[in-house]
A protein has these predicted regions:
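Short, Lys/Arg- and Gly-enriched loop/turn segments at beta-strand edges
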Residues: 278-290
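Short, glycine-/Ser/Thr-/acidic-enriched flexible segments
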Residues: 232, 277, 317
C-alpha cells in the first residue's frame, strides 16, 4: 500500500509493506519515480525512524558507528496513521511499535501552509514492564537523498556545511562527495561503507564549531534539500550510504557522540529534538527563502514584535562595546 502526500510543493511517499512495516520512500519537491530506487534490499531500508536501545542486537548488514539498522528501529511495525489539519497546516502522526520491548514510536510531521518546509520530531513511549535505555533516536531519517538523476553521486551532489565559531561566524563551504570521503568505491546497489559525513555539537554552546544546519544540492536536477536542528544543546546529523543509496539523519544528542542517555521507565514518554527539513528548486537562495518564511511562521508572538524597539548589536566589535545614541 502506498500513501502519497502532496503539500506546499513537497511530495512524500510512504509504503506499508506485507510485513506491516512502514517506509518513507520519498521526500522532495520533485515527483516520485519508482525507477529511482536502486537498492539491493528493495525498500526494506527506507525506515522513517531509527531508534537505538541499550543491549539489543543489530543483525543487519552495516559498518562503522553510523545509525543504520538500529534496534529496535529495524523491526518496528506499523500501527496507525493520523492525517489532519491544525492551525498551522497539515499534520501527520505515524505510529509504530516494537512488541518485544513495549516501545511505541510516533513520527510527527507538521506542515506549514504555503511553506515548503516541515517540522519533524519523534515521540517515544515505554508501554513495557522494564526500563529502556535510549542511546539514539532520529528526529528525521531519509534514505534515497541521491536517487533523482542519472549521474553518479560524485558528479551531481554537493554538501553545504556551515562552520561557525567565535570570531569566525557563518563560514559556508561546498563539498563534493569525494572531498568528504564518500566517493563511489562499490557498485551502486550494495554501497554501505563505514564512512560518514557527520556534523554535530556537544554542550550548551550549540554553534561553537558548526551551525546546526546543512544543505544537499543536486546539480543535475537543480534541486536542494535543506535542514536545521532546533536545539540549544547537543545535536548531530549524518550523511552516509546504506544498501545502495545515501541517507540523511538528524537528531539531538546521542550516546556515542555526546554521552547522552535516557532511561525510559514503564509509562514514561520522551520527545526528540525538533528539526525542520525542506526542499526546493534552485540553490541556497531558494532554500534560505523557504527557511526564512518558516522561521517567521514559528516565531512566538511577543511584545518586541509589537513595539519594535531599536536594538544595537556591537557585532564583530565594530565600536568595541562603546556605542552612543549618535
Amino acid at each position: 500500500k502506498r500513501i502519497e502526500i502532496k503539500e506546499n510543493n513537497l511530495n512524500m511517499v510512504y509504503e506499508i509493506t506485507d510485513e506491516n512495516e512502514i517506509k518513507l520512500l520519498h521526500f522532495s519537491n520533485l515527483p516520485f519515480d519508482e525507477n529511482d530506487i536502486n537498492s539491493c534490499e528493495g525498500t526494506a531500508s527506507f525506515r522513517p525512524v531509527e531508534v537505538l536501545l541499550s543491549g539489543l542486537n543489530r543483525p543487519g548488514e552495516r559498518h562503522g558507528t553510523k545509525y543504520t539498522y538500529t534496534a529496535p528501529g529495524y523491526r518496528l511495525k506499523y500501527k496507525d496513521m493520523k492525517d489532519y489539519r491544525n492551525e498551522t497546516g497539515r499534520k501527520l502522526e505515524i505510529l509504530m511499535e516494537d512488541k518485544p520491548t513495549g516501545l511505541e514510536v510516533c513520527s510527527n510531521i507538521q506542515f506549514y501552509d504555503g511553506i515548503s518546509v516541515i517540522r519533524s520530531w519523534t515521540e517515544l513511549k515505554n508501554n513495557g514492564e522494564e526500563d529502556l535505555g535510549v542511546e539514539y533516536v532520529s528526529s528525521f531519517a531519509l534514505l534515497g537523498i541521491d536517487k533523482e538523476g542519472l549521474l553518479s553521486t560524485d558528479e551531481k551532489l554537493e554538501v553545504l556545511i556551515a562552520r561557525n565559531a567565535w570570531q569566525k561566524e557563518l563560514i559556508w563551504n561546498r563539498f563534493s562527495m569525494d572531498q568528504l570521503g564518500m566517493s563511489i568505491s562499490q557498485p551502486d546497489k550494495v554501497r554501505r561503507s563505514s564512512q560518514t559525513i557527520s556534523v554535530g555539537n556537544t554542550g550548551n554552546w550549540s554553534t561553537k564549531n558548526y551551525l546546526p544546519m546543512g544543505c544537499l544540492k543536486n546539480k543535475e536536477t537543480d534541486s536542494i534539500l535543506f535542514w536545521q536542528i532546533e536545539q540549544n544543546g547537543s545535536w548531530y546529523w549524518e550523511i552516509s550510504d546504506q544498501d545502495g543509496h545515501m541517507y540523511l539523519q538528524l537528531s539531538g544528542p546521542t550516546e556515542h557522540q555526546s554521552h547522552w542517555w535516557k532511561n525510559l521507565k514503564p509509562g514514561d514518554t520522551f520527545a526528540s529534538v525538533p528539526v525542520s527539513v525542506g526542499s526546493a528548486c534552485g540553490d541556497v537562495e531558494e532554500a534560505a527563502g523557504e527557511l526564512t518564511k518558516y522561521r517567521r511562521a514559528i516565531r512566538r508572538k511577543n511584545e518586541d514584535n509589537e513595539k519594535l524597539p531599536v536594538i544595537f548589536n556591537d557585532y564583530m566589535n565594530c565600536l568595541w562595546g562603546d556605542p552612543t545614541t549618535e
